[in-house]
Amino acid sequence: MADSCCIRLHLLASVFLLLFSSFNLQGIAAENLSKQKLTSLILQNEIVKEVNENPNAGWKAAFNDRFANATVAEFKRLLGVIQTPKTAYLGVPIVRHDLSLKLPKEFDARTAWSHCTSIRRILVGYILNNVLLWSTITLWFWFLLGHCGSCWAFGAVESLSDRFCIKYNLNVSLSANDVIACCGLLCGFGCNGGFPMGAWLYFKYHGVVTQECDPYFDNTGCSHPGCEPTYPTPKCERKCVSRNQLWGESKHYGVGAYRINPDPQDIMAEVYKNGPVEVAFTVYEDFAHYKSGVYKYITGTKIGGHAVKLIGWGTSDDGEDYWLLANQWNRSWGDDGYFKIRRGTNECGIEQSVVAGLPSEKNVFKGITTSDDLLVSSV
């Protein structure tokens, strides 16, 4: 009875989210950009100059190799967070923490839980004979001018992977492909964008398999979203590629799905107590040029919505409070794949869309793999 009730609620939630989001399939800030704008290059000398000559910018801009020759349209396709109306969060709890909790002035999940390799895992992609090969699995990944807007799924699976290690000492990498392909309308539209909260609800109701069970590549070469222009959402297969794993046994579950109260103290307390969280924010043109420092919007057009993993906080030498985040665009982007953004001012909306959930012990102690053989950490 309880299971059937959950299924009905799940279906109602799916229809609800579809009705409230069908008007907008391309990110938090899906701007109607002109054809001329979309075909122009995302990296611009004017933006680099304006940021670097601004004494109050607080960060440095550069031509990141990851976006060399990329157009605005190609960059925009990587921003897969769909705007979710506030009404779609009805029934989703908002977590607040005890304000008396003493928090450190600086915190970095990579050092706080140094035994958890998933927290600091970085991807390195190479092009060989027009085939994208992977040397590691990451912070998520850069589709290299691929066209799958799935940051919403990667932000979720990477954060939950970290939380499994923190709570159960289980170094595991969970499958974004499972979420993108099998979550359905509860999560949104797969490669055409999705809801971060939907992914966490999927973990609760259906669980998510490991990267080893459902990876982003096969023995024939590149088969993950992004290898081809306009790659469609992958088909939900519900079977592991690894012969020694069963789909159901590979599932890892979440306990609940919740939003964190948009107060810096609550967000910091959540990360400090439970591990990294998924955050969504609005991306402008200048963000593609980020190299170092504490980012805040300076110049450029609004492009779309992006989801990343928040792993810590601190204060710069200039006295600027910041959040520390892991992006999905490889080590050649930003500060070795990471970036800092201004904390306490809801910069680009980053403090108002923080979501997470707790890991469940279901299936954890059944002898399933505790590390994916397909993964090689790059730290």
From Swiss-Prot:
SUPFAM superfamilies reported for this sequence: Cysteine proteinases
GO molecular-function term, one example from the UniProt record: cysteine-type endopeptidase activity
GO process terms (BP): defense response; proteolysis
Superkingdom, natural source: Eukaryota
InterPro entries found in the cross-reference section: Papain-like_cys_pep_sf, Pept_his_AS, Peptidase_C1A, Peptidase_C1A_C, Propeptide_C1A
Residues in the signal sequence: 1-30
Pfam families from the UniProt entry: Peptidase_C1 (PF00112), Propeptide_C1 (PF08127)
EC number(s) stated in the UniProt entry for this protein: 3.4.22.-
Glycosylation sites per record: N32, N69, N171, N330
Propeptide residue range(s): 31-102, 363-379
Induction: By dark-induced senescence. Down-regulated by infection with an avirulent strain of the bacterial pathogen Pseudomonase syringae pv. tomato DC3000.
UniProtKB keywords: Disulfide bond, Glycoprotein, Hydrolase, Plant defense, Protease, Signal, Thiol protease
Assigned protein family: Belongs to the peptidase C1 family.
Function: Thiol protease that plays a central role in plant programmed cell death (PCD). In addition to its role in protein degradation, may cleave and/or degrade a number of target proteins, activating signaling towards PCD. Contributes to the increase of caspase-3-like activity after UV-C-induced PCD and is required for abiotic stress-induced PCD. Functions redundantly with CATHB2 and CATHB3 in basal defense and distinct forms of plant programmed cell death (PCD). Participates in the establishment of basal resistance against the bacterial pathogen Pseudomonase syringae pv. tomato DC3000.
PANTHER family: CYSTEINE PROTEASE FAMILY C1-RELATED (PTHR12411)
Name of this protein: Cathepsin B-like protease 1
